[in-house]
């Protein structure tokens, strides 16, 4: 038999939960302590370095862990943004006055687990203190550009809300260091600004990519008539659309890059019916389609980074599913071999030290990696505990254990206390994929782990063997529809009962061996 999900009751539960209010007094004298884990880290959205100190000072923006700073080239990090919104979309360092930093909140890698932001912040003391300086309603910020000649002029690319129309989208400009803002380019309420480039030799020349998108509960539409590539030659007063050589509309997201050493050389990855790589040799006036691998053109809505070497227009890097590079200005790309060891897939940020361009830092769904040989080998930067937990549970042992699933980093468990404190070595992996629900069984020897699409396993903690236990449809049943984040829980009154939900609610009383 099936226990059908009661939609009305589920909706009532959501409404009840929405009315709960939390305040600091509910925690009394309890203080939070950091348990980690830092062994796998989490999604990195932005990396910026300070040019003046040989790249020793780094700022790392994360999808759900705020901003972190290193003053020793990534050997260690400290959190500098705990009091504010933890979803970071963009960072910018004023290289003329490197104590001035801008942080745009609201990640712009528009997947189904993205969090919105609350505006843009400014620090004038290298991240010790921050002040919100506006753009409260844009929700997501994808790029911040500081004018290379007049650092009071700042441009902000705002894709805008993920789930709804909004007039607070587009390209914003400040001429007074962020004290006030003007929306200088706007298409419509469904289209925002995804990327912006200032010509370093003539910063009145601006290239922007506009992006129409909308996420729904069960789908994501990346693209529409509002998307396109535009150019301004007067500092953002007027814009004209660039079309020559680009594919037929509609477009989705467009990633753009300009060579700092030769601003005539540009590359763009254009999401369309036939997503492709395009090259320009005249500053973006005309474009030519280039053959490129699936990895180079993969998922532009999620992989939107394309970077030229600061000093060499022939060297280009494309972080995506994997890391790719070009030695001929983007005419061809090669996939990195990772001779130095594994690097986490799903890559979103890359900062290259302009004084030593062999040194670079790569931001992935699994943290930050450093290379000193142009991306041939990589070293993982430990000590960034910014993993994104979807769900957390615990058992009743002494000390009790903590269980949880992390975005793109599997499912893990660790004791709540250990001699000398909890370290990375105390965390043990019990599942793969995008870890979601991770639930201990009442027998104390078993844990249930689940990853995307309702794929669930029973794990024996004594020998770490796992067995697939997802309920399967019979010939008389409808095709089962599993959520990306599928709930799996044990019974409150009878912990021997295990419940999972597709469009039906299933129960098992034998650890998932059979279901009804």
List each model region and its residues:
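Bacterial Sec-dependent N-terminal signal peptides
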Residues: 1-20
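Beta-propeller blade termini and top-face loops
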Residues: 19-516
